[in-house]
Regions:
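Acidic, metal/ion-coordinating pockets
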Residues: 1-278
């Protein structure tokens, strides 16, 4: 049943037009050989920059993907943490060697920087490890993390790297939009601009309000100037927007995927259906 569910998921990914899949510990539930079999049926590459096939001494899957979209060259690589195994006898580890993620990330950045404008890491390290990586390695623009399953509505910026997280259990979708206003590849989060604009409106209200004491107006005026200065610094810069939305029962299903799921459920009825997000 687990293998059939894996095949169903892969067929769905093919229909959705995936560009790449970063390997995580759940993908190894049925072992190395099954995952290699699945990769041959995928219409997109499986990525892992630090999982080695113990038999051959080579990478299990390709280390990175290069894509060009609207003239922008994008490099995508993937990291897996050996800490996610339960121990040396974990079945998922059989036949695999995991290279050090930090050393691998450094090597990937050196490899990708001359070839790309934007570097994205698909991380299966855990959120704390993503933070640590961003603090110690420069050159990665976005870390899209999984495993921890945190909803980061306001992705933190660590040095020059934004950290995003996949929400848990496939219950949410996410979308990232980039708006380029210049040919540099640094960004600010649109939520930062909205927050500053909201702050400026409130400060202006306080300055105009009759009940605001005169002794406080100098402080509010300084706050207004600081906020306007911060907004001015964003003008002309590149922007990204991060949207997370729940996949509710009322959302319309894709007819082909719905047919596949219904056929699977008729063969393997589940005792309980997961509750949709609220």
């Amino acid at each position: 049943m687990v293998s059939e569910k894996a095949r169903l998921i892969l067929e769905g990914f093919n229909l959705m037009g995936y560009d790449a899949l970063g390997i995580g510990d759940d993908d190894l539930t049925l072992g190395r050989d099954f995952l290699m079999e699945m990769s041959k049926k995928a219409q997109f590459p499986f990525l892992s920059s630090n999982i080695i096939n113990e038999d051959s001494g080579r990478l299990l899957f390709q280390p990175y993907l290069l894509k060009e979209i609207a003239g922008m060259k994008i490099g995508i690589f993937s990291l897996f943490s050996p800490d996610l195994f339960t121990g040396p006898n974990d079945f998922r580890k059989k036949g695999l060697v995991i290279r050090d993620p930090v050393e691998t990330a450094q090597a990937m950045v050196r490899e990708l920087q001359p070839k790309t404008d934007l570097i994205i890491l698909l991380s299966h390290l855990s959120y704390p490890k993503d933070v640590e990586l961003a603090q110690n390695i420069s050159g990665i623009h976005l870390i899209i993390g999984s495993h921890t399953g945190a909803n980061l509505l306001y992705p933190p910026l660590i040095k020059n790297t934004y950290l995003l997280q996949m929400a848990p259990k496939g219950m949410y979708g996410a979308r990232i939009d980039f708006t380029f206003n210049n040919n540099t590849f640094s960004f600010y989060n649109s939520s930062e601009k909205r927050s500053l604009e909201s702050r400026l409106n409130y400060v202006k209200y306080r300055l105009m309000a009759k009940e605001t004491p005169e002794r406080e107006k100098a402080q509010w005026l300084k706050s207004k100037e600081d906020t306007e200065r911060a907004l001015a610094q964003l003008q002309g810069k590149n922007e990204f927007t991060n949207i997370i939305f729940p996949l509710r029962d009322g959302m319309k299903d894709h007819p082909d995927i719905l047919k596949m799921v219904d056929e699977y459920r008729s063969k393997y009825p589940e005792t309980e259906k997961p509750a949709p997000p609220k």
